[in-house]
A protein has these predicted regions:
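Interdomain "pre-motor" coupling segment immediately N-terminal to P-loop NTPase/helicase cores
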Residues: 1-15
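Pre-Walker A adenine-sensing motif
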Residues: 24-42
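Pre-Walker A (Motif I) flank of P-loop NTPase domains
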Residues: 41-47, 143
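Conserved P-loop
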Residues: 48-50, 57-125
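Conserved nucleotide-binding/hydrolysis micro-motifs of P-loop NTPases
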Residues: 53, 80-85, 135-137, 152-153, ...
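Short glycine-/polar-rich loops that comprise or flank the Walker A/P-loop
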Residues: 71-73, 143, 167-171
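Conserved P-loop NTPase nucleotide-binding/switch module
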Residues: 81, 85-92, 158-171
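Conserved RecA-like ASCE ATPase "motif II neighborhood" in helicase/translocase motors
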Residues: 126-161
C-alpha cells in the first residue's frame, strides 16, 4: 500500500514537472543545424526531407523559443486540409473541431517545447493560432512566426497566398 502511494506521488510529481517545463531544441544532425541556421537568418524558408527528419519539429521548436522570449506576438500554424475520405464540410462540429485532427502533430510539438501549461496559456490568449489555409486569404499576420506544415500537399497558388500573408516583422 505504501509503495503504491509512493509510486502515485512520484508519477504526479513527474506530470507536474512536465506540465510547466519547456524543452530546448537541439539539432541532432548537420542538416538540422543548417535548417536551424537558415530559419534564423531568413524570413522565408522552404525545407524538404524524408519523414521523421525533424522539419516540423524544428519549426515548432524555434517558434516556441521566439514566443517564450517575446520576440514575436503570435505563432500561426496551418496546413492544407487534404482529405482521404469525407470532405471537411461533412465532418461534424465547428471549424476548430474539424481542423484539429489535421493540426494535432504540430500542437504536440508546440506542447513539447512550451510545456502543457504555457501552451494552454498562449493558446487561450490566441498567441498560438491554428488557422485553416483555405480561410487565410485577405489576412495579414504581423509580428508572427508562420508555419505551413505539409506544404507538399499545397498548390503553388496556396503557397503564394500563404507567403503573402506575412506582415511586418514576421517569419
Amino acid at each position: 500500500m505504501v509503495l503504491a502511494a509512493q509510486a502515485h506521488n512520484n508519477r504526479k510529481k513527474r506530470q507536474e514537472k512536465k506540465a510547466s517545463k519547456p524543452n530546448v531544441l537541439e539539432a541532432k544532425t548537420e542538416n538540422q543545424k543548417n535548417y536551424i541556421r537558415s530559419i534564423i537568418e531568413n524570413d522565408v524558408v522552404f525545407c524538404t526531407g524524408p519523414s521523421g527528419s525533424g522539419k516540423s519539429f524544428i519549426a515548432a521548436g524555434i517558434a516556441a523559443q521566439k514566443l517564450l522570449k517575446d520576440e514575436i506576438d503570435t505563432i500561426i500554424v496551418t496546413r492544407p486540409l487534404v482529405c482521404t475520405g469525407r470532405d471537411l464540410g461533412s465532418l461534424p462540429g465547428e471549424l476548430n473541431e474539424k481542423i484539429k485532427p489535421y493540426l494535432q502533430p504540430m500542437e504536440e510539438n508546440l506542447r513539447y517545447f512550451l510545456g502543457r501549461d504555457r501552451f494552454g496559456m498562449y493558446f487561450n490568449q490566441r498567441r498560438i493560432r491554428f488557422e485553416p489555409l483555405e480561410t487565410m486569404r485577405g489576412s495579414t499576420f504581423h509580428e508572427s512566426y508562420m508555419i505551413l506544415d505539409e506544404a507538399q500537399n499545397c498548390t503553388l497558388e496556396q503557397i503564394k497566398m500563404f507567403v503573402t500573408r506575412m506582415g511586418k516583422h514576421s517569419k
